[in-house]
Amino acid sequence: MRYLRPLMQAGPARPRDAVALGWCWFTHVEVLSRTEPAQVIPAKDLTPEELARFGDPGTAPQLMGILNTTPDSFSDGGSFDTLERAVAQGQALVAAGADILDIGGESTRPGASLVPEDVEISRTAPVIAALRGAGVDVAISIDTRKAAVAKAALEAGASIVNDVSGFTFDADLAPLCAARGVPVCVMHAQGEPQSMQKNPQYNNVLLDVFDALHERVEALIASGIPREKITADPGIGFGKTQDHNLAILNRISLFHGLGVPILLGASRKRFIGSIGNAPNAQDRAPGSVAVALAAIAQGVAIIRAHDVAEHAQAIALWRASVAHPFA
């Protein structure tokens, strides 16, 4: 099998034969293989079927604001674990520019323990209902691996299900989402949170993650969820070393070949602190923004972020200075 990575560009100097993909375009693709050296070929040499594989990221990148209602999340655990503080933070994220709120009641940081369903529901459903009651009308995503939690969240007003297990943890979750007709995000993770960072191994991390996500996307489609309702996340930091993370980020446009939009969740992750000399997670906004802009330049559709205001400002300036004709 050959893997096709569009070499994304943005800006006004677009050749006539360029292939448009969201706010970006490309004239060449990098052909990757498990057995042959990588090579770059013109996009015009692709078959119509190969060109049709690439997912459209939409007209503009979106920001997903992170709202953890947990006592133990890696960067903000305990900050928003009361209803009042969680609602206030959700409103603040929307005011700062969040297009989506992603609400989670179970930490999936390395080493985290499983949270019982009833506890997770008590941490999330009331917050979602209160946000809707307060007039928050942006899309709300429930970050969960469990069907019962997702069901309660959807009934409270959520409209997206984001599963870090890739819909492998709970067999009832995909059928629930199919029956409700809601969009989903499927993420790649190797192993369980308790042990996923203990010496993760891959043959080729980029292609292994692509293949795993391709299998999950096709499984979700087979379960009744339309392709146009699926977003894929390569799962930065979930069973991956720093080198694994960087290999994915360097060639993240490969994941357009899944035929769905790409979501990136790298905000405040440990590798940003390591490279950027920021041991405190709250000090990693500049590095998080840098990673986000690099991803947007490769056509990533959704950026999941803690520091929404900083990301919103940076993205606005990136679009104005680099991709203005398409803004």
Question: Can you describe what each PLM-predicted range is?
Answer:
Residues M1-P57:
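N-terminal accessory interaction module
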